[in-house]
């Protein structure tokens, strides 16, 4: 499944970021996991193949849902991964349905953060875990459009890390780990963008 990573881990940080989140999430084989904004289900296939857990994917785009289902079949993981078309603000799942909710770079597309986190809290079992990776607005930073997730300011719902943490607390979550990796990400991005030294071929 990881051979598809360039195609199906199209969030910030790609497969590397998914692996880092996996290390923190402490997901067990017996857990039922929900991946919100699953896209082509790359992280879901990573989880299912690495851990043997069952994953439900929630995705708004019918095309992504169809692509995810196809890739699940081609990789032999369709028995462990189910794909649902729907909104993160009105999830088609009962209360207390999942041990873990997984989400990568979805919040900046959603204006109503309180509704989003309330829905996540609703579908989590008591004592369940919410593992997520999110872009955050920097202090005093200016956004230049178009962005990867927004063509103009009306589509951009980026908030600060502090606001995210506050709304999570209001929604009933207790933070076991809330880590700002902005500096590390910036360092990696700068290093990746640096030109390689020129060499002479003889």
Where are these regions (language model features)?
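Conserved alpha-helix/loop element of class I SAM-dependent methyltransferases that forms part
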Residues: 11-29
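Class I SAM-dependent methyltransferase SAM/SAH-binding core
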Residues: 32-36, 40-90
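A short acidic, Gly/Pro-enriched loop at the edge of an enzyme's catalytic core
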Residues: 89-100
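A short SAM/SAH-binding and catalytic strip from SAM-dependent methyltransferases
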Residues: 100-112
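A short glycine-rich, Lys/Arg-flanked "PGG" loop and its adjoining helix->strand segment in the class I
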Residues: 114-129
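Short, glycine-/aromatic-enriched active-site segment of Class I SAM-dependent methyltransferases
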Residues: 135-155
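Short alpha-helix
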Residues: 156-172
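C-terminal helical/coil "lid" or tail adjacent to the Rossmann-like core of SAM-dependent
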Residues: 178-202
């Amino acid at each position: 499944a990881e051979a598809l990573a360039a195609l199906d881990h199209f969030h910030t940080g790609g497969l590397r970021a998914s692996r880092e989140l996996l290390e923190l999430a402490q997901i067990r084989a017996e857990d039922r996991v929900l991946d919100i904004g699953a896209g082509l289900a790359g992280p879901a296939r990573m989880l299912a193949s690495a851990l043997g857990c069952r994953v439900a994917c929630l995705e708004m785009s019918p095309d992504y849902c169809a692509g995810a289902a196809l890739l699940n079949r081609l990789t032999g993981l369709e028995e462990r991964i189910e794909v649902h078309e729907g909104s993160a603000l009105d999830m088609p799942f009962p209360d207390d349905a999942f041990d873990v909710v997984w989400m990568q770079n979805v919040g900046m597309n959603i204006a109503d953060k309180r509704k989003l986190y309330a829905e996540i809290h609703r579908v989590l079992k008591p004592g369940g875990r919410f593992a997520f990776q999110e872009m955050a607005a920097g202090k005093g930073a200016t956004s230049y459009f178009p962005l990867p997730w927004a063509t103009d300011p009306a589509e951009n719902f980026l908030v600060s890390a502090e606001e995210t943490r506050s709304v999570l607390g209001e929604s009933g979550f207790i933070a076991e780990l809330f880590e700002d990796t902005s500096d590390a990400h910036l360092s990696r991005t700068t290093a990746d963008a640096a030109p390689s030294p020129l060499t002479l071929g003889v």
